[in-house]
């Protein structure tokens, strides 16, 4: 069995993992980053959106940011292995990997920065070629520079679909709308306009449409039902793309390729009305958001908690991003669904936490304090919030950690 030894093994080459690896390497630790994708960088590689105040022109270009991060990591001496899938994690700590020049990494400490996975809602006909996840469409356009279709509809109303709809439009794809999924056993609140509006009102300040911002100021979570009833059946436009809260895609049409969809008008609570129409198109993008990819944390023996406000099941962690499993740290979307800026800031906190745990950093070091302050600042000012009750989720997580503090070093 081929073996590689190091001070720190980082699982996941996104912004959280890379930032942590860079700081740990600069602090004198030997670091190996394992990433399953052909190119490291995580979801940064597919991100392109406006971000007021960022850079010279107010655009967030994830690929450029990823290149800069990776260059810093390599200059710090971080070894980055792409195309390497981690399939197991044994105590003390042996990382089992496939696709690398070695089969096992023996590390004193492990950072799990595996990110998140996209959820989909089943729609009749969703296995027809031309029906893909919204995240896949984003990769086609922003990573490979390929338009996955000419005329598209988004299924699912959430931050992810709204963001990617605009990215598709910027790439020259005609996006006919962002519609609801059909009501069913797997769609739950995602198919209920009232519940969707309740979530959107919590994020109305970020809305690109003045009408949506006004709606957020008028309606609250308690009056979301009224907002859903009054929502125009023809939709409200976001960047010239109709947001169709009172229309659901109930079927994807086609044989060897998507040729269109069936759209049905729905009530304020998602019930079908029987009023249907067909729309010709060649691309359907489905998404019900993201959930934390936390299986390796479970395998490591980390204590977990179900926190819907953070997107699902997440590991409990402390102020240094340490978990209850000795020597195991976490950062990024495995801790809850947030934006890339927050993940990058968490990576810095984890990096300094790892150095502190290794005895390479004095207690309350100014750099560590600055990293925590940066995380709080970035989180408070984040332009993208995937879950409206994020603060409640973070509070729950902090309360759950308190009695466990000290279990991990």
State the predicted function of each range.
Residues 2-409:
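Residues forming the flavin
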């Amino acid at each position: 069995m081929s073996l590689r030894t190091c001070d720190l093994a980082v699982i996941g080459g996104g912004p959280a993992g890379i930032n942590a690896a860079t700081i740990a390497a600069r602090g004198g630790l030997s670091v190996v980053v394992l990433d399953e994708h052909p190119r490291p960088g995580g979801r940064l590689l597919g991100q392109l959106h406006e971000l007021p105040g960022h850079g010279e022109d107010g655009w967030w270009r994830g690929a450029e940011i990823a290149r800069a991060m990776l260059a810093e990591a390599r200059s710090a001496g971080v070894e980055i292995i792409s195309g390497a899938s981690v399939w197991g994690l044994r105590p003390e700590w042996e990382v089992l990997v496939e696709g690398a020049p070695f089969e096992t990494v023996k590390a004193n400490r492990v950072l799990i920065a595996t990110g998140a996975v996209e959820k989909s809602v089943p729609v009749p006909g969703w296995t027809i070629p031309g029906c893909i996840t919204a995240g896949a469409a984003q990769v086609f356009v922003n990573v490979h520079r390929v338009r996955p279709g000419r005329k598209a509809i988004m299924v699912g109303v959430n931050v992810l679909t709204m963001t990617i709809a605009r990215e598709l439009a910027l790439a020259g794809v005609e996006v006919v709308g962002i519609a609801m999924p059909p009501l069913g056993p797997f769609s739950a609140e995602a198919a209920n306009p009232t519940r969707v509006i309740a979530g959107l009102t919590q994020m109305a300040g970020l809305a690109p449409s003045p009408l949506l911002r006004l709606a957020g100021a008028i309606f609250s979570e308690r009056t979301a039902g009224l907002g859903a009833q009054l929502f125009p059946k023809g939709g409200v436009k976001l960047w010239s793309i109709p947001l169709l809260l009172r229309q659901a895609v109930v079927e994807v049409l086609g044989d060897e390729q998507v040729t269109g969809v069936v759209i049905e008008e729905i009530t304020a609570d998602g019930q079908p009305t029987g009023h249907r129409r067909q729309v010709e198109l060649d691309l359907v993008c489905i998404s019900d958001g993201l959930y934390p990819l936390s299986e390796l944390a479970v395998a490591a023996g980390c204590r977990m908690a179900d926190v819907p406000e953070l997107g699902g099941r997440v590991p409990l962690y402390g102020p240094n991003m340490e978990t209850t499993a000795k020597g195991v740290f976490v950062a990024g979307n495995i801790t809850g669904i947030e934006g890339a800026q927050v993940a990058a800031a968490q990576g810095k906190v984890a990096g300094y936490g790892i150095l502190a745990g290794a005895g390479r950093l004095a207690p309350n070091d100014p750099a560590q304090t600055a990293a925590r302050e940066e995380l709080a600042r970035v989180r408070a000012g984040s332009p993208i919030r995937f879950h409206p009750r994020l603060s409640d989720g973070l509070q729950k997580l902090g309360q759950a950690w308190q009695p466990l503090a000290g279990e991990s070093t």
